[in-house]
């Protein structure tokens, strides 16, 4: 059924949650939907941990054989998925909660395995390889953290200078690297 306002405005209400929404809301014990990329799958037999990667960080999901409506062996790293499950507090999980899975819907799967091991904490690849494969290497939590730290430092300087009455400018005459011409 089509909602006419969605059709006219071109906007559809978001049906999935982010990490921040779960942390600020009272979702403990409630069913939620969440999208993400499969960062890692740790199969322990009857139970498996599916780690989802979102822009805000990692989310631990718990797969239980016979409870979750999906075969865990069909799940590949870097698949885009939508999960349905119940939020449970778990202090050992990232952000202090986990999702007990009921359903996993694969939205897309990678055509081939990643050229570098992005789910490992330390990728053990050369700088040249990391730079050559930058869009892929930035999916690694540790590599991304370096940029988050840099962003925080720059924002701190910018905020301080703003409070001191400075004006931020962006001019083509001042560039970060040597320009040709």
Put a short name on every predicted segment.
Residues 1-181:
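Class II aminoacyl-tRNA synthetase catalytic cores and aaRS-like
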């Amino acid at each position: 059924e089509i909602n006419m306002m969605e059709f006219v405005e071109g906007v559809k209400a978001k049906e999935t949650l982010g990490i921040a929404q779960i942390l600020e809301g009272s979702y403990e014990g409630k069913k939620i939907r969440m999208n993400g990329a499969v960062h890692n799958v740790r199969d322990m037999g009857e139970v498996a941990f599916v780690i989802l990667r979102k822009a805000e960080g990692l989310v631990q999901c718990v797969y239980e054989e016979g409870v979750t409506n999906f075969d865990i062996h069909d799940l590949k790293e870097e698949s885009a998925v939508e999960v349905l499950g119940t939020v449970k507090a778990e202090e050992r999980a990232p952000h202090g909660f986990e999702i007990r899975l009921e359903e996993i819907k694969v939205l897309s799967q990678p055509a081939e395995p990643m050229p570098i091991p992005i789910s490992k904490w330390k990728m053990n690849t050369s700088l040249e390889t990391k730079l050559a494969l930058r869009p892929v290497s930035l999916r690694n939590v540790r590599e991304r953290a370096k940029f988050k730290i840099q962003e925080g430092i720059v924002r701190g300087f910018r905020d301080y200078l703003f409070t001191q009455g400075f004006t931020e400018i962006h001019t083509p005459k001042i560039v970060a690297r040597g320009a040709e011409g």
